[in-house]
Design a protein with these regions (language model features):
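Hydrophobic/aromatic beta-strand patches that form the interior of the parallel beta-sheet core
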Residues: 1, 77-79, 138-140
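A glycine- and Lys/Arg-enriched "phosphate-lid" helix/loop adjacent to the NTP-binding pocket
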Residues: 19-21, 74-120
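C-terminal accessory extensions appended to soluble enzyme cores
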Residues: 129-245
Length: 245
């Protein structure tokens, strides 16, 4: 189950998306969360298998969903996606741009909404690996590679694996892919370039040395602008979206 499926059933959601794609979800949150809770109860009562996708904004939000399953005799396992903050934010922009490209009316997560869920995950994992109701936690990379599996009472730190992957330096290939996608999004989302630049600044400290910003450690003489040959205006930013992960 995923919250977006319940949002889409709300009679006001499409209108709210057209008016404000960044806050439409928050406007109907109470309704779709209530429906989601009812669906969870329906599944538990019928002993159905269930996989829930979500981005909890707090420890309490996770446990409000997970603990009723444990109390009903379900083994509860978490799969945690460990992604750098810049990559995570860029992915939200990519989903938004792709949806616009095919004529949909998509949502676009706000800075503050992303920040809340991204940083809450640290607390969520720390609490979950200590809680007896959580049978196991598996931390995976963006490409699906498992980094660590922590089982209740066992060794291993899911919190450490999450933090380490989030702080992992980019390889040359990853850095090149990040900037290729950035350039495509820059052309596709001109109204959001301030946020796209924020994503670059988040990524910079983890970039290979050749892609780090220049240090300003001594005064330099004034320099005039150099002639730069621009790429053709016919450049198609959508080509990035069709290839990007």
């Amino acid at each position: 189950m995923i919250g977006d499926d319940f949002k889409a059933q709300h009679p006001d959601y499409l209108r709210l998306l057209r008016e404000d794609p960044r806050r439409a979800g928050a406007a109907i949150r109470a309704d779709y969360r209530a429906w989601f809770a009812q669906a969870e109860q329906y599944v538990r009562e019928r002993r159905g298998d269930v996989l829930i996708e979500g981005a909890p904004g707090s420890v309490e939000e996770l446990f409000d969903s997970a603990l009723p399953y444990a109390a009903s005799g379900y083994p509860v396992e978490l799969v945690v996606l460990a992604v750098r903050e810049a990559d995570s934010r860029q992915a939200t922009a990519l989903r938004y741009a792709r949806s616009l490209q095919i004529g949909l009316t998509p949502r676009f997560t706000t800075r503050s909404g992303h920040r809340t869920c991204f940083h809450a995950l640290t607390d969520v994992v720390a609490a979950a690996e200590r809680h007896p109701a959580i049978a196991a936690i598996t931390v995976i990379r963006r490409d699906g590679r498992a980094l660590l599996r922590h089982e209740a009472g066992g060794a291993g730190s899911a919190s450490w694996a999450l933090a380490a992957e989030r702080a992992r330096p980019y390889t040359e290939q990853e850095a090149a892919a990040f900037f290729r996608l950035h350039h495509g999004l820059w052309r596709a989302l001109p109204r959001h370039r301030d946020e796209l630049q924020e994503m670059v600044e988040l990524a910079r400290p983890l970039m290979p040395p050749g892609m780090q910003p220049a240090r300003i450690d001594r005064p330099h003489p004034s320099l005039g602008p150099l002639p730069v040959t621009l790429r053709g205006a016919a450049y198609d930013a959508s080509s990035f979206f069709s290839r990007a992960a």
